[in-house]
Amino acid sequence: MVSIRLSRGGSKKRPFYHLTVTDSRSARDGAFIERLGFFNPIARGQEERLRVDNERLEYWKGQGAQMSDRVAKLIKDAAAA
């Protein structure tokens, strides 16, 4: 099954996440099919907190990709804002 989830980047104590389309069997930070955007939980001031390619997100959802709980919440919150 294909899933849309976060993969961690950044350094120790300074997390940064990429929204990736990946096979659900691969490791969290392992191989991925496509990168759809990023999430920066420690963004300050004018820094961008979330960026998502909505066109590609809708494409992958149409192909049957399942979003993780956290990604679904981020997308929902971004749409409301």
Curated annotation (Swiss-Prot):
Keyword GTP-binding: no
Record-level Gene Ontology MF annotations: structural constituent of ribosome
InterPro entries for this protein: Ribosomal_bS16 (IPR000307), Ribosomal_bS16_dom_sf (IPR023803)
Keywords: Ribonucleoprotein, Ribosomal protein
Example of a GO cellular component annotation carried by this entry: small ribosomal subunit
BP terms from Gene Ontology: translation
Record carries keyword Ribonucleoprotein: yes
Pfam families, per database record: Ribosomal_S16
Family: Belongs to the bacterial ribosomal protein bS16 family.
NCBIfam families in the cross-refs: S16
Protein name: Small ribosomal subunit protein bS16
Organism of this sequence: Teredinibacter turnerae (strain ATCC 39867 / T7901)
Gene for this chain: rpsP
